[in-house]
Amino acid sequence: MTFFSELPGPSGTTVRLLNEQLYSLTVNGRPIAAATLLPEQLEEFAAGYLITEGITAYSEIESIMPDTAVIGVLTVNPFKVLLPRKTVVSGCGGTASYLDPARLPKVPNGDCLSLSGLTPDFPAEILAAGGFTAAAYTQTGRVASASDISQHAAFDKVIGSLLRQG
């Protein structure tokens, strides 16, 4: 997949722009969120977003159908109204946060992995353009990585990728 479009710039130069697109995420036909994303790993983004926002369990997702501007998700019970269960401050929205860092569990030293030699190949052009990459490693050795124009979207794609891998 190409991450960039090349457009004519001033004085005969070429301008490279990330191919970001606005998507509406819907669940059972109801709008849940709008996100500007790179047009790849859209199913992974939808799964990761719905899980991290506490909207539904992965086992409740029946299907994910990305289109040109909408990522539609159907759940096992389409009549159940699903809404986010938490609000976390991000950017300049000015909302309340219910995430208390003091209550988060500590990671035991034995659960930490040495990342020496495990770093996946991140697209250098995404990083150079100010984009973000994310990677996750499981204790069973599964690896997932993703890139996007925001770190939240990259993490949601990684989480969704691991969920879809099983």
What do the PLM-derived regions correspond to, one by one?
Residues 166:
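Acidic, glycine-enriched active-site microenvironments
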Residues 1-134, 139, 144-152, 156, ...:
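Intrinsically disordered, low-complexity regions enriched in acidic/Ser/Thr/Pro/Gln residues
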